[in-house]
Amino acid sequence: LRLLNLINQILEFRKTETQNKKLCVSKGNIAPLIHEIGLKYKELNQKTKIDFQIQIEKEEMLLFFDKEIITIVLDNLISNAIKYTEQGRVTLSLYQTMRNEVAYTEIKVSDTGYGISAEALPHIFDRYYQESGKHQASGTGIGLALVKNLVTLHEGEIRAESMQNEGSTFYISLLTDNIYPNAL
């Protein structure tokens, strides 16, 4: 199963690199999808010292989105959060915010894990980059690069904040009113 996931991740990454991955959006309520993804990880989480939380601001949040892309992005971010957290909390949040009079729908994945060093933080979305150190886990270094490519394809933004030994937070910002005229 792990090998299959790795192969799928590499194939998805290549599609984003060669512009063969197409954005396929439909208008809908994103809240149930986020809740469903969160419940999957809440049930799959085998680390008893991690409290997995789902925080959804409103039951109805309408926007155009690509369900497959959102799922792949969150699968990567949440599995990383669980992998790099021994104990504490992993939280998946969905909310709406305004910046410069523009409405955004934001998805946030935060953890109380090992965190990312200040030196590594600017490079985490680079292809094949892996932070070295005592908490390095097995991987290919394409997970976050794939996430970045998919969020960019979705015309969104992703950013990360982290403090070593305190945890990390990843923010995905999507324009709430984007109608994606060039999407399928």
Q: What name fits each language-model region?
A:
Residues 14-25:
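Helix-loop junction within the histidine kinase core
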Residues 143, 147:
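Short alpha-helical Gxxx[C/S/T] motif in the catalytic ATP-binding
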Residues 24-29, 46, 51-61, 97:
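Conserved catalytic submotifs in the C-terminal HATPase_c
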Residues 129-139:
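Glycine-rich ATP-lid/hinge loop adjacent to the conserved G-boxes
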Residues 2-13, 33:
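Coiled-coil phosphoacceptor/dimerization helix of two-component systems
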Residues 116-128:
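Short conserved segment of the HATPase_c
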